[in-house]
């Protein structure tokens, strides 16, 4: 019996069905004069630095909704565990829910092991979760903490990649903040020096990026203490008015005046009460 060989195209691991669907939707919307929604730019400046005895994390407090300032004093430094905190940039809902979920899982891990969690454990949980969602969770994070092995600082990207560095910045104002770090960072800094450096880095992001603004929050973590400084400084303090800037009536000359009579149609309405007896 002759064998029948039928060629079958190998099935790849990626499905392009949604790509074809999006192309059809885009063509259909274009006929009606509509455009598909585009990715929305988010704005934030977050940073962290390792000093001699621990970690200093910093963030601005402006939340934006497109080109509108939605909140002037939101907190972007999230609790993970008593010895670990995390700064979040990107989509506010994603950063909030992601850090809350990891904080809960880390508390269960701590109860199971009977000791404080390590920073590398939180980093592994975050990177595995974000990689699983392939970047669709818009959470760019700066994770910092102190455990039995010393201070640790990580940057975690939305796709799941991570870096361990002595100083990190993320967000739309990260370039300005990184310029300050590369100019003034040095190893084995004292706490006050580290706080001042992070404050200057966040201020650089605030003054050079429209998506960052308002106040500067800091979180200082060491083996002996935890300081949450909110706000640490207010670089954009509103000025005080020293006088009344109102012109008296008649100050501006009226060059021409035209009065147009309007035809108004008056309608009369009567309401008849309903007999309920």
UniProtKB/Swiss-Prot annotation:
Its main location: cytoplasm. The keyword Ligase does not apply. Gene3D superfamilies: Glutamine Phosphoribosylpyrophosphate, subunit 1, domain 1 (3.60.20.10). One of its GO terms (molecular function) is threonine-type endopeptidase activity. It is an enzyme of class 3 (hydrolase). It catalyses: Cleavage of peptide bonds with very broad specificity. Its EC number is 3.4.25.1. Residues 1-43 form a propeptide. PROSITE patterns: PROTEASOME_BETA_1 (PS00854), PROTEASOME_BETA_2 (PS51476). It is found in: Cytoplasm; Nucleus. The active site is at residue 44. Keywords: Cytoplasm, Hydrolase, Nucleus, Protease, Proteasome, Threonine protease, Zymogen. One of its GO terms (cellular component) is proteasome core complex. One of its GO terms (biological process) is proteasome-mediated ubiquitin-dependent protein catabolic process. InterPro entries: Ntn_hydrolases_N, Pept_T1A_subB, Proteasome_bsu_C, Proteasome_bsu_CS, Proteasome_sua/b, Proteasome_suB-type. Belongs to the peptidase T1B family. The 26S proteasome consists of a 20S proteasome core and two 19S regulatory subunits. The 20S proteasome core is a barrel-shaped complex made of 28 subunits that are arranged in four stacked rings. The two outer rings are each formed by seven alpha subunits, and the two inner rings are formed by seven beta subunits. The proteolytic activity is exerted by three beta-subunits PSMB5, PSMB6 and PSMB7. Component of the 20S core proteasome complex involved in the proteolytic degradation of most intracellular proteins. This complex plays numerous essential roles within the cell by associating with different regulatory particles. Associated with two 19S regulatory particles, forms the 26S proteasome and thus participates in the ATP-dependent degradation of ubiquitinated proteins. This is Proteasome subunit beta type-7. It comes from Sus scrofa. The lineage of its organism: Eukaryota, Metazoa, Chordata, Craniata, Vertebrata.
């Amino acid at each position: 019996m002759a064998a029948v060989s039928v060629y079958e195209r190998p099935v790849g691991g990626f499905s392009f069905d949604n790509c074809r669907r999006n192309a059809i939707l885009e063509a259909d919307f274009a006929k009606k004069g509509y455009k598909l929604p585009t990715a929305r730019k988010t704005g934030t400046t977050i940073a962290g630095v390792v000093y001699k005895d621990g970690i200093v994390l910093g963030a601005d407090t402006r939340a934006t909704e497109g080109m509108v300032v939605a909140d002037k004093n939101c907190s972007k430094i999230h609790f993970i565990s008593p010895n670990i905190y995390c700064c979040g940039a990107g989509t506010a809902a994603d950063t909030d829910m992601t850090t809350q979920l990891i904080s809960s899982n880390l508390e269960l891990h701590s109860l199971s092991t009977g000791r404080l969690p390590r920073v590398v454990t939180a980093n592994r949980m975050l990177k595995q979760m974000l990689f699983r969602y392939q970047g669709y969770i818009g959470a760019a994070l700066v994770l910092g903490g102190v455990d039995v092995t010393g201070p640790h600082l990580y940057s975690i990207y939305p796709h799941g990649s991570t870096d361990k560095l002595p100083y990190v910045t993320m967000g739309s104002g990260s370039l300005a903040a990184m310029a300050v770090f590369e100019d003034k960072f040095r190893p084995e800094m004292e706490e006050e020096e580290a706080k001042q450096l992070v404050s200057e880095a966040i201020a650089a992001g605030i003054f050079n990026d429209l998506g960052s603004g308002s106040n500067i929050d800091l979180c200082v973590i060491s083996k002996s203490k935890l300081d949450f400084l909110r706000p640490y400084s207010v670089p954009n303090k509103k000025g005080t008015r020293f006088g009344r800037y109102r012109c008296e009536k008649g100050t501006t000359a009226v060059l021409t005046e035209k009065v147009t009579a309007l035809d108004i149609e008056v309608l009369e309405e009567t309401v008849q009460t309903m007999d309920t007896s």
